């Protein structure tokens, strides 16, 4: 079975994020490569989940990156990343342990990114968070 790329256009239709299917872990979660129009090289050899969320002005894109993926157990950790396509930078918003949780962007409100962390386990807790991402330390230039 050939999986077609998932194209996620920006709200202004001037940019697009493209997820290309790479595989599936034992739990059924799928993982992808990510391509962005204007950033061809810096995302190579990185693995992403299926969630991409654009800001309403099409400047920011938030994604879930998988770190140290194991095809059976899944990723060692999930990163919630944000890309600033105007300044061509990226920043880690949050990180959670992959075997016990998952992290997903939910929405942009003003200068904040709302996101959810789902903690697996016996009681399965879900927590919502807010990050004023533009003031985070650790922004790095995309190559």
Segments predicted by a language model, with ranges:
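Surface loop/turn motifs at the tips and blade-to-blade linkers of beta-strand repeat domains
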Residues: 42-47, 94-97
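Short beta-strand elements that form the blades of beta-propeller/WD-repeat-like
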Residues: 11-26, 58-71, 108-120
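Structural motif
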Residues: 25-33, 69-82, 121-135
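Acidic, small-residue rich beta-repeat scaffolds with periodic aromatic anchors
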Residues: 1-11, 83-143
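Short strand-turn-strand beta-turns centered on an Asx-Gly dipeptide
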Residues: 36-41
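Acidic, low-complexity, intrinsically disordered interaction modules
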Residues: 52-57, 63-77, 87, 99-104, ...
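Ordered hydrophobic segments in well-structured contexts
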Residues: 33, 51, 60-62, 79-84, ...
């Amino acid at each position: 079975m050939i999986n077609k790329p998932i194209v996620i256009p920006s709200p202004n239709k001037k940019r697009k994020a493209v997820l290309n299917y790479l595989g599936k872990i034992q739990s059924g979660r799928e993982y992808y490569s990510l391509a962005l129009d204007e950033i061809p090289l810096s995302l190579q050899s990185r693995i992403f989940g299926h969630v991409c969320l654009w800001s309403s002005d099409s400047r920011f894109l938030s994604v879930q990156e998988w770190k140290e993926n194991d095809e059976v157990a899944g990723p060692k950790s999930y990163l919630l990343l944000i890309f600033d396509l105007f300044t061509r930078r990226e920043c880690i918003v949050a990180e959670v342990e992959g075997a016990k949780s998952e992290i997903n962007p939910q929405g942009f409100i003003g200068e904040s990114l709302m996101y959810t962390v789902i903690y697996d386990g016996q009681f399965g807790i879900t927590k919502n968070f807010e990050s004023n991402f533009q003031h985070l330390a650790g922004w790095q230039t995309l190559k």
